Amino acid sequence: MRGTSKKISPPRRLIVDLMLASRDVPFVSLARSLNIRALLEARGLLAQPPGFAAIFAKAFAIVARDEPTLRTVYAKWPWPCFYELPRSMAMVAIARVEDGEPCVLPQCVCGPDRLALTEVDRLIRHAKEAPIAEVPMFRKIMRATHLPWPLRRLAWRIGLNFARQRGNWFGTFAVTGVAAYGGGELQALSPGPYILSFDVAKPDGSIAVMIRWDHRVTDAALIARVFSQLEQVLNTEIATELRGLRAVELKALREPVRVAGARGSGHLGL
């Protein structure tokens, strides 16, 4: 049957290149249901709560502070080795529409454990809403994607195989999910060593989380421990930060608002 040939757009070409780069990574998966009731209660109090991508990015990076293996990548050049990075680099999958075509682009958040949760969320939202030219990570990957195939292949080989560049280009872990589109179990692919995906939070306070990892770097025992640590961090450090944001919201509501051009007291108490 005769069809129509269509040109591959740059965002789609990026996915093609990513899948080629991911095909040699021996991924293994482990899924678990986490009880995050305390986190959900704290988040539910906020008028503008941070998204779950930001929450999981920061929580995983906090766990990785004391687990160097979660900041380790496998590299082939100049010889096969493990390369440990000093801090986490999260690659968050951003779903957006470019020229009428749905696409997914990775936003880099460097050291999310060192940033306020609101800042992590701001970086993710900026990547979703701003033009591609205004997002540094997008500009970087789009420049590589527009290269002719021989040069593009060389750039990918350098990024994949040199230890330092692998961390710079693909991060130490990725965060993705389809919770915003109804949820489901997502077995994603990435050249990076770890991929965390999450489902929709359930009314009973649980959420299904999957971690896929490069089996060359670690084994299932560590990942099983990571789930327990992740659950604890979500319900303690992250929940505490969310409650702090609620306190800030309440304080802002109680503060008087100055009316422009008003005389006398010039305030309206809210």
Predicted features, each with a name:
Residues 1-270:
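C-terminal catalytic/motor cores of large multi-domain enzyme assemblies
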